[in-house]
Every structure is written in structure tokens, then in C-alpha cells.
């Protein structure tokens, strides 16, 4: 979580708000350093960050990975990070995620 909240978050912001394609690609590549490490951790731990089941660590990091993926979904898919893709889908499609992302009825 510490690496996510420092190195990854800093580069994620640079990637999201880059002023040039060169800056955006550089920030993307920096983010991919963390993404590849996370992909390996997820593989090692059988599908999630700490173990075989969802934990607070997964929920803490997911919003940042979601932001990264949403900048350019096709570019992310081209990286072939299968473990992260599966992990992402499980959380994104979960009833918990859908519940917290439900827009409130303000009328």
C-alpha cells in the first residue's frame, strides 16, 4: 500500500494529467513497474494481494488501479497483465463494488 500511495500515485497523476505524449508514455511506463509487480504478487497469492480471498489491501489499491485502467483501457489490455485483469474484473463486478458505486437518488 505504501508503494501504491507514493510511487504509483505520483506517476498515476502524471499519466492522467500529462501535457505531452512523451510525458504520458514515460508516466505510463513508470506505472507499469508497479503494475507488473502487483500482477506477480496476485499470481503468487492465488488471485488477490494477500491471500486467496479479498482483503482490505485489495480494496485499498483497487481505486488507483481503476483510475489507471480508465485512462486508456485498450492500452492497458495490450500489456497482457492477466492476473491484474482477472483481479480487476472480480472486484469491479462484485456486489460490494456495485453497492458503493451506486449513485444516490437525489430527487
What are the residue ranges of the model-derived segments?
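Long, charge-rich low-complexity segments
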Residues: 103-107
Amino acid at each position: 500500500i505504501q508503494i501504491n500511495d507514493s510511487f504509483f500515485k505520483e506517476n498515476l497523476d502524471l499519466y492522467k494529467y500529462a501535457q505531452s505524449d512523451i510525458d504520458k508514455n514515460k508516466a505510463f511506463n513508470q506505472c507499469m513497474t508497479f503494475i507488473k509487480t502487483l500482477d506477480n504478487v496476485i499470481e503468487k497469492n492465488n488471485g488477490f494481494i494477500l491471500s486467496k480471498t479479498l482483503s482490505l489491501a485489495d480494496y485499498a489499491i483497487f481505486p488507483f488501479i481503476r483510475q489507471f485502467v480508465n485512462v486508456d483501457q485498450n492500452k492497458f489490455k495490450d500489456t497482457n497483465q492477466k492476473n491484474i485483469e482477472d483481479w480487476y474484473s472480480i472486484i469491479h463486478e462484485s456486489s460490494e463494488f456495485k453497492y458503493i458505486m451506486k449513485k444516490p437518488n437525489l430527487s
